[in-house]
Every structure is written in structure tokens, then in C-alpha cells.
Amino acid sequence: MPRSYELLPIGDNAPEEVNAVIEIPRGSSNKYEYDREHGIFRLDRPLYSPLFYPFDYGWIAGTMSADGDPLDVLVIGSHPTFCGCVVTCRPLGVLLMRDEKGADEKILARVAHDPRYSGVRTLAHLPTHVLREVEHFCLLYTSPSPRDRQKSRMPSSA
């Protein structure tokens, strides 16, 4: 039976804690997309480069970005989850990007109840290497060639 992720609320404690629906687990080299019509996750494609998702990737429930899709989110946690998993997470900041449709923000968040990240409240609390890794991944994962890549930048915390 298909799941109705569209009916899932943003979260009881938003904006401090929000519900994220995971499309792609950490470590995957496959890009999955949610098929709204059928209520399932489909393999969109393997990544073009020998990359993997550095953290779980999905969307924040109950949101809508300028491009008509829910807000994208990368969820930092100790372990990968799975396609379709709903994770309560705490937003930390945003990665400002552009794609063919225009602005394409990626929210960076952490698992709300992961004791390994309990002290992380803003992007400033993350190691610089983690931020660079996320930024690097986001620059490379959609484009097969360097000339197609868009610039991104990591601003201050949310």
C-alpha cells in the first residue's frame, strides 16, 4: 500500500525539530526519487561520478520551495537510515545553490536524538571538513561534466 508522505506534517516542534523523509541513505551511489503518483521510491539513476551521499538526503515534510518541490535536506547522523524513513531532525543551516530552475537550497540538519551530535546546534559546531565535504558533494553529484556545475556557498547558521 502506498504511503502518503504528502500528508506528513512538518513536525510538532517546528522549526526547532522537523520531519525529514529520506529518499537516499548515506553511502548510496544511487539517486532515488519519490514517485508521488504511485507513492513509491524509484531509482532515478546511479550518480555520474564515483561519489556517494555523505549523509542521508531527502526532503522536509510539509514544506514547499520556490521550485515547487519540498525543501531538500541533508541529515547528519551516526548511521544511514533507509529510503522512506521519517527522521525527526534539527535544522542547522542552509547551503545556497542554483540549478536549471534557479535557487536550490539544501537544508543541513542533524538527527534530533542522536547523542553523538547533541552538542551541534548550528553549522559553526560542525567540523570544517564536514561542511567542505557536503559542499563538494553538492557541487558534483548532479553534473556529469565540470562545465555544467553551479557554484555553491555555505552561509552562516540558520
Q: What kind of feature is each model-predicted range?
A:
Residues 141-148:
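Conserved small/polar residues in nucleotide/adenosyl-binding loops
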Residues 152-158:
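Hydrophobic alpha-helical segments, chiefly the membrane-spanning helices
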